Each structure stands twice: as C-alpha cells, then as structure tokens.
C-alpha cells in the first residue's frame, strides 16, 4: 500500500492547545473590556434570582462588539446561580437570523422547555399561531420560575415580520399571571441602533425599558482579546 499523504504530517506536533477557543462560535469564560456592560445587565437580571421580574432590555452595538458573547456568559452564570440557591431561572437564546417568523420563534421557545423524557414537540408548521402561544404559556407556567428570552438579531426579525411577536412577548406576563406563577423578561440584541423606529410605540416602550450600548472595540482592546485567545489556544513559542 502506498504512502498516505497525511503520514508525514501526523508526526508534526500541533500548534494548538485548544483550537476551539480561536473560533468565532467559542463562548469565552472571560470577557475583557466589557465590565461596564456586564455590570449593567447583571444588575437588572439579578432580580430573577430574587423571584422578581427583570426589566426588558435592548442591547445595541455593531457586529463583533461582544453582545452575544456577553449575554450568553451572563445567562449561563445566572442559570448556574439559580440552581445553586434553588431558584428556577430559565434563559433561552433565539437566533432570529435563522428562526425568523413569529410561529418559529414561539415553537422554538415552547420546545426548549420540554424535559429530556418529553416528546410533545410543537410541530415546525401546522398549528394556528394562537395555539402555539397558548402552549408556550402553559409550558412556561409548568416549568415555573423566571424565564429570560433572548432574541438575538431582533432587528432582522422585526424588519422581516413586524412587531406582533414582540407585542405578545412583552405582554406575556399578563397571560402567565392568569394561569400560574411563572414570569418572563425579554432581552433583544440588535446591530441596528435605529431598529426601534420600526416598532409600534406601545411595543417600543415595553421592550426598551433598559438599553445597553456596546461600543466597538478599539485597536488596543482587540489586541488584548487576540493575545488572550492565543495564550489559551496556541502552544507557547508557536508564534513569533
């Protein structure tokens, strides 16, 4: 059998300790230069650990400003602390670039609340939207606690299908209170600082109870981030 083209490469040591930390999809455990934004968001969301309803929020900033990474980090910490102290907090992250209709968002939220042994998925299509919403409310109350719905790229969703979904989600606590004890807040993440111009004033006032602006990283901050990623992802002395 002839020589395999990979034979000589396998004998070479890898440059990487952990290549995953260099990928765009990596969720870092440390977020340099975002302390101010983390402080503002956690100050609001800590209310969930006290059994209260956090304010709805919108996070603004250009692509690459760390909005998604910061939100995922905080929600992971929030959920972990809730388990530690016996408070049910249920964050759900929705990518509205791919899940981009009212039906699909509601179905995704509802199905995210199923336990591992439950198989009653809301179908990808086929139900009236009102029925999907009712099922979501029922499942949220069955799960209990405080639900944190994160709508990433919310500006894309609004521009495509309007603000009916946001109206329903911003008013969902009224439906939850009538039928149980669960509560909910909504966090929107937007690349467009002006996307709220597309919203009905009633939706705008309820969704934007608190705003957090993520400024772009400057050159020094980007250098710090790259050096941090390289330090944990690439073997020492591999770069010169």
Where does each model-flagged region fall?
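A short, basic N-terminal segment
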Residues: 1-55, 77-80
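Conserved catalytic segments around the Walker B and adjacent sensor/switch elements
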Residues: 56-58, 81-98
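Post-Walker A helix-loop "phosphate-sensing" segment adjacent to the P-loop in P-loop NTPases
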Residues: 76-88, 115-118
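Mid-core helix/loop region of P-loop NTP-binding domains shared across ATPases and GTPases
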Residues: 2-17, 54, 71, 90, ...
């Amino acid at each position: 059998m002839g020589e395999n083209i990979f034979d000589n490469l396998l004998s070479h040591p890898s440059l990487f300790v952990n290549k995953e930390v260099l990928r765009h999809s990596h969720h870092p455990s440390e977020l340099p230069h975002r302390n101010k934004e983390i402080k503002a968001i956690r100050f609001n969301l800590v209310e969930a650990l006290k059994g209260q309803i956090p304010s709805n929020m919108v996070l603004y900033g250009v692509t690459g400003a760390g909005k998604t990474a910061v939100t995922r980090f905080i929600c992971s910490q929030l959920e972990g602390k809730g388990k530690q102290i016996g408070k049910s907090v249920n964050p759900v992250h929705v990518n509205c670039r791919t899940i981009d209709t009212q039906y699909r968002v509601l179905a995704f939220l509802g199905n995210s609340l199923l336990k591992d042994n439950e198989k009653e998925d809301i179908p990808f299509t086929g139900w009236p939207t009102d029925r999907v919403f009712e099922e979501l409310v029922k499942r949220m109350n069955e799960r209990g606690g405080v639900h944190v719905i994160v709508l990433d790229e919310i500006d894309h969703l609004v521009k495509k299908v309007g603000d009916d979904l946001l109206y329903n989600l911003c008013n969902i606590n009224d439906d939850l209170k009538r039928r149980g004890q669960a509560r909910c807040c909504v966090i929107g993440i937007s690349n467009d600082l002006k996307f709220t111009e597309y919203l009905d004033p009633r939706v705008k006032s309820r969704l934007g109870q608190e705003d957090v602006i993520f400024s772009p990283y400057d050159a020094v901050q980007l250098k710090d981030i790259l050096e941090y990623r390289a330090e944990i992802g690439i073997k020492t002395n591999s770069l010169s």
